[in-house]
């Protein structure tokens, strides 16, 4: 979840009690959403559960990170693109399948305590470059890659690994789909 910003490796996996340090406009918007949820819970007793979702794969997601990689591989296989472009491949993420993410949201509604924040994410982590290499290995053609400076973030968050113990305790949720099934 972008709300935590760049964390020290000693603070991984990231717990819900970690300070919120958004490092991009997108992260600020997610942090604001989280804090508004808290405000509406405390001010108006609205049943708001604050979820902090980490990276998930979705074939219909816009051209971000993993979805962009998959789309580019498909285009290269069809001869519509010559090389795969990417940003920072050294970042580390926990990645889950969109179906696991949606099931987690449903379980949060059913079992989590209003006002509380819950991390939702994978139980394993992968370097973005390793993820890309695994995806390329599934391709039927040779794929050349190139770092595009326009895809490098000014303030990149390089380590996003959640502690999902609190969410698991409330819901018994854990990811069911593997990388290969996503």
Which ranges hold each PLM region?
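Catalytic Tyr-x(3-8)-Lys segment
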Residues: 18, 85-92, 171, 175
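Active-site helix of classical SDR
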Residues: 25, 29-32
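Conserved Rossmann-fold NAD(P)-dependent oxidoreductase catalytic core, especially the SDR/UDP-sugar
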Residues: 1-24
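NAD(P)-dependent short-chain dehydrogenase/reductase
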Residues: 7-13, 35-93, 98-109, 123-125, ...
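Residue-level signal for the nucleotide or nucleotide-sugar donor/cofactor binding architecture
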Residues: 17, 23-24, 64, 93-99, ...
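C-terminal "lid/loop" region of Rossmann-like NAD(P)-dependent oxidoreductases
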Residues: 84-88, 115-118, 126-133, 140-159, ...
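Non-catalytic, hydrophobic alpha-helical segments
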Residues: 101, 105, 120, 131, ...
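C-terminal amphipathic/interface module of NAD(P)-dependent oxidoreductases
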Residues: 159, 163-182
């Amino acid at each position: 979840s972008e709300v935590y910003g760049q964390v020290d490796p000693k603070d991984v996996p990231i717990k819900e009690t970690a300070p919120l340090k958004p490092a991009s406009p997108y992260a600020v918007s997610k942090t604001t959403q989280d804090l508004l949820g808290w405000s509406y819970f405390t001010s108006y007793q609205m049943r708001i559960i604050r979820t902090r979702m980490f990276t998930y794969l979705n074939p219909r997601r816009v051209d971000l990170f993993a979805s962009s990689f998959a789309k580019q591989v498909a285009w290269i296989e069809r001869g519509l693109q010559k090389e795969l472009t990417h940003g920072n491949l050294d970042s580390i993420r926990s990645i889950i399948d969109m179906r696991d993410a949606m099931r987690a949201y449903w379980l949060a509604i059913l079992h989590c305590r209003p006002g509380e924040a819950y991390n939702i994410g994978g139980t394993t982590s992968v370097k973005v470059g390793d993820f890309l290499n695994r995806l390329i290995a599934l391709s039927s053609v040779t794929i050349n890659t190139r770092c595009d400076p326009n895809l490098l973030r000014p303030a990149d968050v390089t380590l996003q690994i959640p502690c999902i113990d609190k969410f698991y305790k409330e819901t018994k949720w854990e990811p069911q789909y593997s990388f290969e099934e996503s």
